[in-house]
From Swiss-Prot:
One Pfam assignment: MreB_Mbl
Organism: Escherichia coli (strain K12)
Sites where the protein binds ATP: 19-21, 168-170, 216-219, 296-299
Role: Forms membrane-associated dynamic filaments that are essential for cell shape determination. Acts by regulating cell wall synthesis and cell elongation, and thus cell shape. A feedback loop between cell geometry and MreB localization maintains elongated cell shape by targeting cell wall growth to regions of negative cell wall curvature. Filaments rotate around the cell circumference in concert with the cell wall synthesis enzymes. The process is driven by the cell wall synthesis machinery and does not depend on MreB polymerization.
This protein's encoding gene: mreB
Subcellular location(s) per record: Cytoplasm
InterPro entries attached to this UniProt entry: ATPase_NBD (IPR043129), MreB (IPR004753), MreB_MamK-like (IPR056546)
Protein name per the record: Cell shape-determining protein MreB
Amino acid sequence: MLKKFRGMFSNDLSIDLGTANTLIYVKGQGIVLNEPSVVAIRQDRAGSPKSVAAVGHDAKQMLGRTPGNIAAIRPMKDGVIADFFVTEKMLQHFIKQVHSNSFMRPSPRVLVCVPVGATQVERRAIRESAQGAGAREVFLIEEPMAAAIGAGLPVSEATGSMVVDIGGGTTEVAVISLNGVVYSSSVRIGGDRFDEAIINYVRRNYGSLIGEATAERIKHEIGSAYPGDEVREIEVRGRNLAEGVPRGFTLNSNEILEALQEPLTGIVSAVMVALEQCPPELASDISERGMVLTGGGALLRNLDRLLMEETGIPVVVAEDPLTCVARGGGKALEMIDMHGGDLFSEE
């Protein structure tokens, strides 16, 4: 009874703690925070205490532009915690930001979405980070399950649903039926690998060095996973490695398609393996109803077309794919209240 009473007054949070972005969904309010998973840490002298200089958008602006005493860090790598201290500081900052007036409210229950490939140690680190950031109770849910719920798939029915969640650090492929994950796999390929591939292509073919932010802009503006009818172009500047000075050059969408071949092949093969290993009845459900793409990577132009051509199965990009996992986590919190926490692990 007391738990229920406290739950009425605290803002329950669903957190999609991503490699690229952190999203927070609050019950009854929707997505209230969508910020880059970046923290700027200041340390004035060796051995002096570290302090947080900026978090989120402000810190992302600093990537590659910081003086010696400030380091802009991305504490999540491949979907899991790479820097425990910085992740906890980032979560504290974000939870404080959305859980205002906490003087009157009890600390929130927090549901965190974790990659299917996360080990027990990595899950415990995520759980302890959330507790250290002020959570009263922590639930963990696997990302593909949250993505499927957020995309509106019938996860509780005796029918196979396939979700491909392409985040910043990982791509999670899962087949879901009767509130359970029947098959899941995680490959460490995502939006970051796309950016890396573009940086490497430019270095190899233009002898120029570009930063992460420029690579991301190229990906968003002219990136494509399948040859299109029109060829788009973009003007960029990078540091010429031979001359050591900035130089401008033009890239087109066909070049970026070529640059992205390796990571795209990895995603396609992960999907093919999932289809091969799926039980026959569920495979027939999927071939009839298709698969759903979620996550920021699903926004890459023509990715649905590529997967459709390679698998021969209908592919749909979820509505607002970037927020699917966080929204699904929010719905899952409501399911906890109705059915108890059997969908989720508290450890």
